[in-house]
Amino acid sequence: MLSLILTIFFVHVAIYLVNTVGATTIDTLLWILYLKLPTSTSRNARQQSRLKREVVQLKREMNNTSSQDEFAKWAKLRRKHDKAMDEYEAMNKKLTAQKTSFDWSVKIARWLSTNGLKIFLQFYYSKTPVFALPAGWFPFYVEWVLSFPRAPRGSVSVQVWNSVCATAIAVMAEIVTSMLLQLRSRSASPASTAKAQKAQ
Protein backbone atom coordinates (compact mmCIF):
# COMPACT_ATOMS: atom_id res chain seq x y z
CA MET A 1 0.00 0.00 0.00
CA LEU A 2 1.27 3.45 -0.92
CA SER A 3 2.02 5.73 1.99
CA LEU A 4 -0.14 8.79 2.57
CA ILE A 5 2.78 11.07 1.66
CA LEU A 6 3.21 9.50 -1.79
CA THR A 7 -0.52 9.10 -2.41
CA ILE A 8 -1.11 12.83 -1.93
CA PHE A 9 1.96 13.65 -4.02
CA PHE A 10 0.83 11.47 -6.95
CA VAL A 11 -2.71 12.88 -6.77
CA HIS A 12 -1.24 16.37 -7.13
CA VAL A 13 0.99 15.24 -10.01
CA ALA A 14 -2.13 13.91 -11.77
CA ILE A 15 -4.02 17.15 -11.11
CA TYR A 16 -1.10 19.19 -12.46
CA LEU A 17 -0.83 17.04 -15.60
CA VAL A 18 -4.57 17.31 -16.28
CA ASN A 19 -4.44 21.09 -15.83
CA THR A 20 -1.31 21.42 -17.98
CA VAL A 21 -2.27 19.13 -20.84
CA GLY A 22 -5.88 20.25 -20.75
CA ALA A 23 -9.06 18.39 -20.00
CA THR A 24 -10.41 18.75 -23.53
CA THR A 25 -7.22 17.29 -25.00
CA ILE A 26 -7.50 14.31 -22.68
CA ASP A 27 -11.22 13.92 -23.47
CA THR A 28 -10.51 13.98 -27.21
CA LEU A 29 -7.71 11.44 -26.88
CA LEU A 30 -9.92 9.11 -24.82
CA TRP A 31 -12.76 9.49 -27.37
CA ILE A 32 -10.39 8.51 -30.20
CA LEU A 33 -9.20 5.50 -28.19
CA TYR A 34 -12.81 4.57 -27.38
CA LEU A 35 -13.68 4.62 -31.08
CA LYS A 36 -10.92 2.06 -31.70
CA LEU A 37 -12.73 -0.46 -29.48
CA PRO A 38 -15.24 -2.87 -31.09
CA THR A 39 -18.42 -1.13 -29.92
CA SER A 40 -21.63 0.07 -31.53
CA THR A 41 -20.35 3.63 -31.20
CA SER A 42 -17.26 2.83 -33.28
CA ARG A 43 -19.50 1.20 -35.91
CA ASN A 44 -21.59 4.38 -35.97
CA ALA A 45 -18.44 6.50 -36.33
CA ARG A 46 -17.21 4.40 -39.26
CA GLN A 47 -20.63 4.60 -40.90
CA GLN A 48 -20.72 8.37 -40.34
CA SER A 49 -17.33 8.85 -42.01
CA ARG A 50 -18.42 6.61 -44.92
CA LEU A 51 -21.60 8.67 -45.34
CA LYS A 52 -19.59 11.89 -45.21
CA ARG A 53 -17.29 10.67 -48.00
CA GLU A 54 -20.34 9.61 -50.02
CA VAL A 55 -22.01 13.03 -49.57
CA VAL A 56 -18.84 14.84 -50.64
CA GLN A 57 -18.44 12.55 -53.67
CA LEU A 58 -22.07 13.04 -54.75
CA LYS A 59 -21.78 16.81 -54.28
CA ARG A 60 -18.65 16.82 -56.45
CA GLU A 61 -20.45 14.80 -59.16
CA MET A 62 -23.45 17.15 -58.99
CA ASN A 63 -21.21 20.18 -59.43
CA ASN A 64 -19.52 18.54 -62.43
CA THR A 65 -22.89 17.77 -64.05
CA SER A 66 -24.82 20.53 -65.82
CA SER A 67 -28.34 20.87 -64.43
CA GLN A 68 -29.59 22.21 -67.77
CA ASP A 69 -27.83 19.92 -70.26
CA GLU A 70 -28.04 16.66 -68.28
CA PHE A 71 -31.06 17.30 -66.08
CA ALA A 72 -32.06 13.62 -65.61
CA LYS A 73 -28.57 12.65 -64.43
CA TRP A 74 -28.33 15.77 -62.24
CA ALA A 75 -31.76 15.10 -60.66
CA LYS A 76 -30.81 11.49 -59.92
CA LEU A 77 -27.56 12.64 -58.29
CA ARG A 78 -29.49 15.28 -56.34
CA ARG A 79 -31.89 12.65 -54.93
CA LYS A 80 -28.97 10.39 -53.97
CA HIS A 81 -27.17 13.35 -52.39
CA ASP A 82 -30.24 14.43 -50.39
CA LYS A 83 -30.84 10.87 -49.16
CA ALA A 84 -27.18 10.42 -48.17
CA MET A 85 -27.17 13.85 -46.51
CA ASP A 86 -30.26 12.97 -44.43
CA GLU A 87 -28.65 9.68 -43.34
CA TYR A 88 -25.41 11.51 -42.52
CA GLU A 89 -27.19 14.14 -40.42
CA ALA A 90 -29.17 11.48 -38.52
CA MET A 91 -25.99 9.49 -37.85
CA ASN A 92 -24.16 12.67 -36.87
CA LYS A 93 -26.87 13.56 -34.31
CA LYS A 94 -26.70 10.05 -32.87
CA LEU A 95 -22.91 10.14 -32.66
CA THR A 96 -22.94 13.63 -31.11
CA ALA A 97 -25.34 12.42 -28.40
CA GLN A 98 -23.07 9.44 -27.71
CA LYS A 99 -20.00 11.71 -27.55
CA THR A 100 -21.77 14.05 -25.11
CA SER A 101 -22.63 11.11 -22.87
CA PHE A 102 -19.06 9.83 -23.11
CA ASP A 103 -17.64 13.28 -22.27
CA TRP A 104 -19.80 13.53 -19.15
CA SER A 105 -18.68 10.08 -18.01
CA VAL A 106 -15.02 10.96 -18.58
CA LYS A 107 -15.37 14.29 -16.75
CA ILE A 108 -16.96 12.60 -13.75
CA ALA A 109 -14.31 9.87 -13.68
CA ARG A 110 -11.51 12.42 -14.06
CA TRP A 111 -12.88 14.62 -11.26
CA LEU A 112 -13.39 11.65 -8.92
CA SER A 113 -9.88 10.33 -9.56
CA THR A 114 -8.16 13.69 -9.03
CA ASN A 115 -9.93 16.45 -7.11
CA GLY A 116 -12.51 14.11 -5.60
CA LEU A 117 -9.77 11.86 -4.25
CA LYS A 118 -7.89 14.89 -2.91
CA ILE A 119 -10.98 16.12 -1.03
CA PHE A 120 -11.71 12.62 0.28
CA LEU A 121 -8.14 12.27 1.57
CA GLN A 122 -8.35 15.68 3.27
CA PHE A 123 -11.51 14.74 5.17
CA TYR A 124 -10.72 11.10 5.87
CA TYR A 125 -7.19 11.74 7.13
CA SER A 126 -7.83 15.16 8.70
CA LYS A 127 -6.78 13.95 12.18
CA THR A 128 -3.98 11.71 10.91
CA PRO A 129 -0.45 13.13 10.83
CA VAL A 130 1.29 12.76 7.49
CA PHE A 131 4.60 12.64 9.33
CA ALA A 132 5.89 13.73 12.72
CA LEU A 133 8.25 16.63 13.26
CA PRO A 134 11.34 16.18 15.47
CA ALA A 135 10.50 17.26 19.03
CA GLY A 136 11.75 20.69 20.03
CA TRP A 137 13.00 21.72 16.59
CA PHE A 138 10.25 24.21 15.88
CA PRO A 139 8.53 26.80 18.08
CA PHE A 140 4.98 26.18 19.26
CA TYR A 141 3.33 28.48 16.70
CA VAL A 142 5.13 26.80 13.76
CA GLU A 143 4.06 23.36 15.00
CA TRP A 144 0.49 24.66 15.34
CA VAL A 145 0.45 26.02 11.76
CA LEU A 146 1.93 22.81 10.33
CA SER A 147 -0.64 20.66 12.14
CA PHE A 148 -3.57 22.93 11.23
CA PRO A 149 -6.54 22.24 11.34
CA ARG A 150 -6.93 18.92 13.18
CA ALA A 151 -3.70 16.90 13.17
CA PRO A 152 -1.86 16.39 16.47
CA ARG A 153 0.55 19.18 17.38
CA GLY A 154 4.11 18.34 16.35
CA SER A 155 3.09 16.78 13.05
CA VAL A 156 2.25 17.87 9.50
CA SER A 157 -1.43 17.75 8.55
CA VAL A 158 -2.90 16.51 5.27
CA GLN A 159 -4.03 20.02 4.34
CA VAL A 160 -0.53 21.47 4.79
CA TRP A 161 1.02 18.56 2.89
CA ASN A 162 -1.48 19.13 0.05
CA SER A 163 -0.38 22.76 -0.19
CA VAL A 164 3.30 21.81 -0.07
CA CYS A 165 2.90 19.19 -2.83
CA ALA A 166 0.90 21.50 -5.11
CA THR A 167 3.41 24.32 -4.70
CA ALA A 168 6.47 22.08 -5.10
CA ILE A 169 5.11 20.46 -8.27
CA ALA A 170 4.24 23.84 -9.82
CA VAL A 171 7.67 25.29 -8.97
CA MET A 172 9.55 22.21 -10.25
CA ALA A 173 7.56 22.28 -13.49
CA GLU A 174 8.44 25.95 -13.99
CA ILE A 175 12.13 25.24 -13.34
CA VAL A 176 12.20 22.29 -15.76
CA THR A 177 10.32 24.28 -18.42
CA SER A 178 12.67 27.25 -18.18
CA MET A 179 15.72 24.94 -18.31
CA LEU A 180 14.38 23.21 -21.43
CA LEU A 181 13.66 26.55 -23.09
CA GLN A 182 17.17 27.74 -22.19
CA LEU A 183 18.72 24.59 -23.68
CA ARG A 184 16.62 24.91 -26.82
CA SER A 185 17.61 28.54 -27.32
CA ARG A 186 21.30 27.64 -26.87
CA SER A 187 21.10 24.81 -29.40
CA ALA A 188 19.25 27.04 -31.90
CA SER A 189 21.70 29.88 -31.41
CA PRO A 190 24.81 28.18 -32.97
CA ALA A 191 22.76 27.09 -35.97
CA SER A 192 21.57 30.64 -36.65
CA THR A 193 25.12 31.97 -36.18
CA ALA A 194 26.45 29.44 -38.70
CA LYS A 195 23.78 30.47 -41.24
CA ALA A 196 24.65 34.13 -40.75
CA GLN A 197 28.37 33.39 -41.33
CA LYS A 198 27.59 31.44 -44.52
CA ALA A 199 25.49 34.34 -45.81
CA GLN A 200 28.46 36.72 -45.43
Swiss-Prot record:
One of its GO terms (biological process) is tail-anchored membrane protein insertion into ER membrane. It comes from the Eukaryota. It is a multi-pass membrane protein. The chain crosses the membrane at residues 5-24, 111-131, 156-172. Residues 42-100 form a coiled coil. It holds the Pfam family CHD5. Residues 25-110, 173-200 are cytoplasmic. Keywords: Coiled coil, Endoplasmic reticulum, Membrane, Transmembrane, Transmembrane helix, Transport. Residues 1-4, 132-155 are lumenal. Its main location: endoplasmic reticulum. Belongs to the WRB/GET1 family. Required for the post-translational delivery of tail-anchored (TA) proteins to the endoplasmic reticulum. Acts as a membrane receptor for soluble get3, which recognizes and selectively binds the transmembrane domain of TA proteins in the cytosol. This is Protein get1. The lineage of its organism: Eukaryota, Fungi, Dikarya, Ascomycota, Pezizomycotina.
